[in-house]
């Protein structure tokens, strides 16, 4: 019997892929520190919201990222709260992603990630939505590089991995499963 190739759950373009990020998610993470030879796990509530790059927040982040007015910029706010993880120290935070699609290739473009905290550096890099329907983010600041891969197992289950490299070796890896709690507000 001839093996059957798995049916693609989604056939999304980049904008549809990013739009599917929006909403409230329960995120479960398993991570490993190569430097400390230590594994861990955590869970948190994650909220992803899209912002207009022309708002005051959008203009402020563009300025911090060193970008001029970019009409095609897609700006996402990702906030997390690990209060759902009983027995762990509580952490809340917010990070922003800015995606600037390539005019000739809509499945790739420039990327930056940062916060409104002026003491923390923005990471810059690129992204690519592959034919395997996996979004790869490559970010760095010179000595540290971060590679994240995001994909959907179903409309309400997003999976992702991250790998941090410092110098010649890897320092940290993580696997996340994100279960949608609420779709984005209409």
UniProtKB/Swiss-Prot annotation:
InterPro entries, alphabetized: Calycin, CpcS/CpeS
Catalytic activity, EC: 4.-.-.-
A Pfam family per the record: CpeS
Top-level taxon: Bacteria
Keyword Transcription regulation: no
Entry keywords, A to Z: Lyase
Example of a GO MF term: lyase activity
Role noted for this protein: Covalently attaches a chromophore to Cys residue(s) of phycobiliproteins.
Protein family: Belongs to the CpcS/CpeS biliprotein lyase family.
Protein's recorded name: Chromophore lyase CpcS/CpeS 1
Gene: cpcS1
């Amino acid at each position: 019997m001839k093996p059957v190739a798995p049916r693609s759950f989604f056939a999304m373009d980049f904008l549809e892929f990013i739009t599917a990020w929006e909403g409230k998610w329960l995120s479960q993470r398993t991570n490993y520190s190569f430097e400390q030879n230590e594994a861990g796990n955590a869970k948190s509530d994650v909220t992803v919201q899209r912002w207009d790059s022309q708002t005051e927040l959008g203009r402020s982040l563009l300025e911090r990222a060193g970008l001029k007015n970019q009409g095609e910029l897609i700006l996402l706010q990702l906030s997390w709260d690990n209060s759902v993880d009983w027995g762990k120290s509580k952490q809340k935070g917010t990070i922003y992603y800015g995606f600037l699609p390539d005019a000739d290739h809509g499945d790739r473009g420039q990327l930056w990630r940062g916060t409104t905290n002026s003491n923390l550096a923005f990471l810059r890099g690129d992204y690519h939505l592959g034919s395997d329907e996996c979004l790869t983010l490559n970010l760095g600041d010179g000595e540290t590089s971060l590679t994240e891969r995001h994909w959907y197992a179903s409309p309400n289950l997003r999976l992702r991995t991250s790998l941090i490299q410092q110098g010649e070796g890897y320092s940290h890896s993580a696997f996340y499963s994100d279960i949608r709690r609420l779709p984005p507000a209409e």
